[in-house]
Amino acid sequence: PRFEDVPAAVEKRIVEDVENVFYPTKPVVPFLDIVHDRAVLELFRGCTRGCRFCQAGMLYRPVREKTPERLLQIAKDTIANTGYNEISLMSLSSADYSKLPELVDMLMEEFKDKQVSVSLPSLRIDSFSIDIAKKVQQVRKSGLTFAPEAGTQRMRDVINKGVSEEDLLAACTNAFKSGWNTVKLYFMMGLPTETDEDLAGIADLAYKVLDLHRDITGKRNGSVTVSVSFFVPKTHSPYQWYGQQDVEEIHRKQRYLKSLINNRNISYHYHDGYTGYMEAAFARGDRRLSKVLVKAWEAGCKFDGWTEFFNYETWLKAFADCGLDPAYFARRTRDFDEPLPWDHLDCTVSKAFLKREWEQAVDANLTSDCRRGPCKGCNVCPELNTAIIDYKEGGRVEKVTFGLK
């Protein structure tokens, strides 16, 4: 620290009682259309599924749920104040909310005569409920989105996704039998230990889902959208030490996967490799990159999250003008003992736990969810003197865990 009154490490703070925390039920409603033009209902905070690529799953631990009654009141107030006609149930893994069936019933009953729909984000395959999906589609029908994340079981185990091909096909079977014809699948490319066989598994899964629709319905009007993002290693996650793959290699993989998908009923979308490269540089960068941001802005970089505004050469020049190389931050695999630029930001998940998870990933071993199972020793609960709050057994359950340094 540069000043005596500044602590060496800044520890995160959390809201222990999410039930009674302030919630913005009177948001500003713009006159023009925006991306998330709907009411948002936060079911709970935190996620302990333990996906190794996920920064948010580490940062926002532990899980703390709200009651259905509190959520219903928030929804009623927000709709009354905004006039929105859609409520999105948002959390890191919304389908894991212990009282989701009860909440959906309450929302549908409350808004059945007001043409207010309820929507769910992309769903975990292993917590998907066709009954809930059918209920939320009563007002406004849409496609279903699942997130297998990887094409082979080995790769899904590496990232600790904890779902199988059988889980995906079972979920799609239920969906197709219930009248859905469209499914969207989310994947990532460039993950640690990934091979071309794992990429081929993405195409293979897409074809299996499409064939499943034809077998169940006897029709050829099914469609599958395959959306593949470029993996960006994030701080405070087990992959914070991992160097991102070269952009040229990612482009090769994108072409390879595209060559395997030759069906008009399968749409293939992928993210720009150069944008992902810049994201990785800033995701694992240090304070020197603040000068790069200023240089890029002075050179005209604005709204660069949109590909039509993104100018890769301008960003490279901004780095060069500051005497820096983005590859140093994005592509370099760091040593376990190396001090990290973000070590002074303490999210209370111990570095020892993240190292163990990296080692588990290399061996393709799964780590189970501590939400309703044994503690995995991430250190969050004892460090913050807090507990997991879950309503699965009916009433409020506060599960206290321990830490392993």
Where are these regions (language model features)?
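Glycine- and acidic
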Residues: 36-40, 52-62, 84-92, 151-158, ...
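Short, glycine-/Ser/Thr-/acidic-enriched flexible segments
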Residues: 26-28, 45-49, 58-61, 78, ...
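Cysteine-cluster motifs in flexible loop/terminal segments that predominantly coordinate metals
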Residues: 54, 334-404
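Ferredoxin-type iron-sulfur electron-transfer modules in oxidoreductases and energy-metabolism complexes
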Residues: 30-31, 66-76, 80, 103, ...
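Acidic, low-complexity intrinsically disordered segments
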Residues: 1-56, 61-63, 69, 305-345, ...
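Conserved SAM/AdoMet-binding glycine-rich loop
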Residues: 77-225, 229
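Terminal amphipathic helices with adjacent charged low-complexity linkers/tails
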Residues: 3-13, 63-67, 74, 94, ...
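Flexible glycine/acidic-rich beta-alpha junction loops that bind and position SAM and/or redox cofactors
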Residues: 49, 98, 128-132, 154-159, ...
